[in-house]
C-alpha cells in the first residue's frame, strides 16, 4: 500500500522540507502529487534529522503545503534499451525529441557499482578522433579517461561535437557508439547541439542527454550518471565500444557546491564540498575495459577552467583522477586557429600503449616526439625574437622558428568537418618536419627517415 503524506513544512527555492514520519533513504526518489492531478519527481538530499530535504526535478512553482508526498523506496533508474540510440533526452532521462518514452529492457540504478580493479584490463587500442593534435601527439586509447581543459569563450563545444561525429576504433569489429551529456547549457547551446547531431547524421549512433541552465541543480548531478549508465549498458550488454563526452564538468561541480550549501555542509576549497574529489572519481572511474566483456567505456570529460586557472580545484582534482589532459589555448584561439589545442601542456598518459606498428604506424612515437621538441624550441625562440629580433638568430634557429609557425598552421589548424586519418596526420607531420635539416631530426630513427621523409619518398 502506497502511503501519501501531507507533512510539507516549508518550500524554499527548488527545495521542499517534509516532516519525517518513516525511515527515508538518502537519494530516495519522491513523488509529489499536485492538486491538479499531475505529479512531480524529487530526490532526497538530506534525511539525517526529523526534517527531510527534497530537491524537486521540475522546480517548485505551483507547489503548496497541501501537496501529497510519496516516498517510493527506490533510487533513480535509467530505462535501458538499445532503443536509446538515436534519442535526445533530458538530464533525468525524459524524451526531448518528441519521440515516445523508452520501453526498458532493464531498469538500471544510475549510481552504478564500483568496478573490481582485478577485473579491469589495461587500455591499449587506438581511438581515432580525426583531430591531429589528439591523434598525433596526445592519443586517446580505448578505455581511457582523457579530459579537455578549456575556458570560457573557447570552442570546446565545437571540439566535443567534432569528436562525437568522427570518433572510431579503426579495424574493430565491434559497433561504436557515442553518449553525449551536456550539463548547465543555455537553450541556444541545446538547439545547437540537437541540430548538429541531427544534421550530420551522428545521432544514429548516439544517445544525447541535455540538462539546461534553468533546470534544477539536482538534475545536473543526475545527468552524467544517466549518461554513464547508458554507456555501461551499451558496452557490457551489447558489446559496443562507447565514447562518453561530458560537458561541462564545471557546471556539475557548481551544482555540487549548491547542493552542499543547501544541506548546510562545511565547505572545502573555494566553497566546494570536501568530498568533491571522491564525487568526481565516481564519474571518471566508470571508464574502462572489463575482462570477458566485448565492449568498453572511454571518457572525454570537458571542463572550463574558471579564470583560465589550471590550479582551480575542478581541473586540479580532475587531473589527479584522469589519465592526462588536452589543453585548449586562448592564445591559439586569438590567432584564429581551430582547434586551438596547445600540445605542450597537453598529455595522454596512456598514449604509448595505443600506438605503434600494429596499432597506428611504426613511426608514430618518433614523429610525435620530434614535432613536440621542435615546436617547444620554436616557441622558446619566439620569446628571444621579441627581445633581440629575428636578425640575431642563427640559420638553424630561424628554421625552428619557422617550424613552430608551420606546426600551428598546418598540423594544429584543420577544418571543423575535416576528419583526418592517422596516416594523414603523420604524413602532415613528416611534411612540416622536412622543413628542418635532417641532422636536427635526432629523435627519429634513420630507417624511418629513409622510409617516410618526403625527400626520400620522392626518390623511391
From Swiss-Prot:
GO terms for molecular function: ATP binding; proton-transporting ATP synthase activity, rotational mechanism. It is found in: Cell membrane. It is a peripheral membrane protein. GO terms for biological process: proton motive force-driven plasma membrane ATP synthesis. The keyword Iron-sulfur does not apply. Keywords: ATP synthesis, Cell membrane, Hydrogen ion transport, Ion transport, Membrane, Transport. Coiled coil: none annotated. One of its GO terms (cellular component) is proton-transporting two-sector ATPase complex, catalytic domain. It holds the Pfam family ATP-synt_VA_C. PANTHER family: V-TYPE PROTON ATPASE SUBUNIT B (PTHR43389:SF4). HAMAP family: ATP_synth_B_arch. Belongs to the ATPase alpha/beta chains family. Component of the A-type ATP synthase that produces ATP from ADP in the presence of a proton gradient across the membrane. The B chain is a regulatory subunit. Has multiple subunits with at least A(3), B(3), C, D, E, F, H, I and proteolipid K(x). This is A-type ATP synthase subunit B. It comes from Methanosarcina barkeri (strain Fusaro / DSM 804).
Amino acid at each position: 500500500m502506497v502511503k501519501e503524506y501531507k507533512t510539507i513544512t516549508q518550500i524554499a527555492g527548488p527545495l521542499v522540507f517534509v516532516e519525517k514520519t518513516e525511515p527515508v533513504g538518502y537519494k530516495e526518489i519522491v513523488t509529489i502529487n499536485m492538486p491538479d492531478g499531475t505529479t512531480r519527481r524529487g530526490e532526497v538530499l538530506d534525511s539525517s534529522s526529523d526534517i527531510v530535504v527534497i530537491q524537486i526535478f521540475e522546480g517548485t512553482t505551483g507547489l503548496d503545503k497541501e501537496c501529497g508526498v510519496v516516498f517510493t523506496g527506490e533510487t533513480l533508474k535509467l530505462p535501458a534499451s538499445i532503443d536509446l540510440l538515436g534519442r535526445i533526452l533530458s538530464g533525468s532521462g525524459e524524451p526531448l525529441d518528441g519521440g515516445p518514452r523508452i520501453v526498458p529492457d532493464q531498469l538500471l540504478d544510475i549510481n552504478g557499482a564500483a568496478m573490481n580493479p582485478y577485473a579491469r584490463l589495461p587500455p591499449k587500442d587506438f581511438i581515432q578522433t580525426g583531430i591531429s593534435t589528439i591523434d598525433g601527439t596526445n592519443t586517446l586509447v580505448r578505455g581511457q579517461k582523457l579530459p579537455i581543459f578549456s575556458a570560457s569563450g573557447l570552442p570546446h563545444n565545437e571540439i566535443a561535437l567534432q569528436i562525437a561525429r568522427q570518433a572510431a576504433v579503426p579495424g574493430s569489429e565491434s559497433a561504436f557508439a557515442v553518449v553525449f551529456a551536456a550539463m548547465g547549457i543555455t537553450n541556444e547551446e541545446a538547439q545547437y547541439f540537437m541540430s548538429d547531431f541531427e544534421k550530420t547524421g551522428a545521432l544514429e549512433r548516439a544517445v544525447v542527454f541535455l540538462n539546461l541552465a534553468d533546470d534544477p541543480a539536482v538534475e545536473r548531478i543526475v545527468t552524467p550518471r544517466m549518461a554513464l549508465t547508458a554507456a555501461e549498458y551499451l558496452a557490457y550488454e551489447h558489446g559496443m565500444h562507447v565514447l562518453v563526452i561530458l560537458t561541462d564538468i564545471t557546471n556539475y561541480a557548481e551544482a555540487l557546491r549548491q547542493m552542499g550549501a543547501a544541506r548546510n555542509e562545511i565547505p572545502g576549497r573555494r566553497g566546494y564540498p570536501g568530498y568533491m574529489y571522491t564525487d568526481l572519481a565516481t564519474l571518471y572511474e566508470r571508464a574502462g575495459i572489463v575482462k570477458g566483456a566485448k565492449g568498453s567505456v572511454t571518457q572525454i570529460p570537458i571542463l572550463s577552467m574558471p579564470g583560465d586557472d589550471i590550479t582551480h580545484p575542478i581541473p586540479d582534482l580532475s587531473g589527479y583522477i584522469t589519465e592526462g589532459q588536452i589543453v585548449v589555448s586562448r592564445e591559439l584561439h586569438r590567432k584564429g586557429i581551430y582547434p586551438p589545442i596547445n600540445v605542450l601542456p597537453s598529455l595522454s598518459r596512456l598514449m604509448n600503449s595505443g600506438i605503434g606498428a600494429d596499432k597506428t604506424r611504426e613511426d608514430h612515437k618518433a614523429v610525435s616526439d620530434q614535432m613536440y621538441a621542435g615546436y617547444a624550441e620554436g616557441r622558446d625562440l619566439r620569446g628571444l625574437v621579441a627581445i633581440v629580433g629575428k636578425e640575431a638568430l642563427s640559420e638553424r634557429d630561424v628554421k625552428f622558428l619557422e617550424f613552430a609557425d608551420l606546426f600551428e598552421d598546418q598540423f594544429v589548424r584543420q577544418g571543423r568537418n575535416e576528419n583526418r586519418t592517422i596516416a594523414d596526420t603523420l604524413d602532415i607531420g613528416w611534411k612540416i618536419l622536412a622543413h628542418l635539416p635532417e641532422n636536427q631530426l635526432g629523435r627519429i630513427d634513420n630507417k624511418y627517415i629513409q622510409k617516410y621523409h618526403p625527400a626520400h619518398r620522392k626518390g623511391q
